[in-house]
Amino acid sequence: MSSESDTTIVEAIDEVLAWSSLFGDHMDAESVLRNLQVKGSINSILQAIESSPHLSIENDVVYSDKHDRNLNIKYSQELASKHFKETMEVLSILKSCEQITGLALTGSVAAGMNKDDGDVDVMIITKPGWVWRVRALAIYLSHEHPTGQLLCPNMVLSEDSLRFEKTVYTAREMMQIIPIKDSKGITKLYDENGWVKEILPNAQKKPSRPLSKHGDYPWWWRVMKIPLLGQIIESWEARRRIKQLKLTSTSNEALYSKSICRGHENSHKTRIEAEYQNVLEAIL
């Protein structure tokens, strides 16, 4: 007979697996713990699974009879690893940039899965006054560098504009990121969003992914760093890009300002939250 505590943990696990089913993902016990919205431990998860008729664990992966198994997950995981390796050189250039104080993998690759046509999404945190020049560098590398074609710098933020809205979606996305560089930028991100621990009390920042070398910058990057001229270019690039992006934007999730370039044009958050509610209602 299950205890009230076991029942609570089972319900919390059900919620996590409903979430992961939206992405075709299967989580190990540690990932389930990271995503639980109640305080728990690996032992409490294992005990709850043992007490539940619909939960099981195989090779440390937690399954539920309420959701289909993704038979292609190994291939998706191999793609994530492959795409990251293909992008390592261009990421190492960004990592070496002094104006970037935080760099992290986000999205599917950070979750450990990707599609054949998937990108490598990254979050870039810059020193104040550098968002649009750094974005220009990242976009240039994604288009012109031999290893940059998968790079998708869809979020470039100034380190003085790191507060996010308080939602389950945002909390999970934030705790899913894999840091590549943290010269106080990623640390500030978590400090500014301390509410994440209220939603995900067991979550810890993922360890950094090491990158050892870096390549050359385009010649014009030296011009961007000239003090007065660089500031003029930053203002000019910000004005023209913000105007251009706002004119073409079709998503209420996208945000463009002098200190934020959040190009979430596919309304991913809105769609996932709607699907999430439908899945939750179906299993209750």
Where are these regions (language model features)?
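Catalytic core of pol beta-like nucleotidyltransferases
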Residues: 4-50, 56-102, 106-117, 126-284
